Amino acid sequence: PQEYLGTFLLISVVSLLGAGVLLGLRPPAPITSHRDTAEARPLPEIIRQPTYLVAVFGAATAYGVMVLAMTATPLAMVHHNHEMASAATVIQFHVLGMFLPSFFSGSLIARFGNLPIMLCGVGLLTAHVLISLSGTEMGYFVSALALLGVGWNFLYVGATTLLTGTYTVAERGR
């Protein structure tokens, strides 16, 4: 609806400003030891690695699914005659799902590996979609968005952790 247009435009402007600031940042040169002085590979060579592609695709998928569902849910809830306070509660459960697992997702990755945790995230995101399509009562929205948060955490944290293994110290910041 048009009543939310101003909010989305404001968020777009803030996002563009943030991107502009980030593009202007230059990370400091990494501190290297004599073991890290190997010549850096060209960026296209780094990007063509299958592991790199899996990591980037996983992180982008997690982010895309999360943003789409998180922004659409309050609109769907209002459309189905839920109070805005109920939509806020659903988003609170979602945010808990996104960040609470961070206390242990790193340990799970260390124990089971990146790919199993990423696949678990994909499974949770799939469960989110199935629950979202199953009904419009409050319980469906809460459980779907909570699963979305945990699925995002597992897939995004797993993917970005996987990404850190695709380059050397000399190749950071490219």
What are these regions (language model features)?
Residues 100-114:
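Helix-to-loop junctions at the C-terminal end of transmembrane segments
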Residues 27-56:
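Juxtamembrane intracellular "pre-TM" segments in multi-pass secondary transporters
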Residues 133-144:
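Helix-loop junctions at membrane interfaces in 12-TM secondary transporters
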Residues 154-167:
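Intracellular juxtamembrane helix-capping segments at the cytosolic ends
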Residues 12-33:
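C-terminal membrane-cytosol helix-exit motif in multi-pass small-molecule transporters
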Residues 48-69, 146:
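Pair of pore-lining "gating" transmembrane helices in MFS-fold secondary transporters
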Residues 71-90:
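Short amphipathic helix-loop junctions that connect adjacent transmembrane helices
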Residues 116-131:
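Structural signature of the two symmetry-related core transmembrane helices
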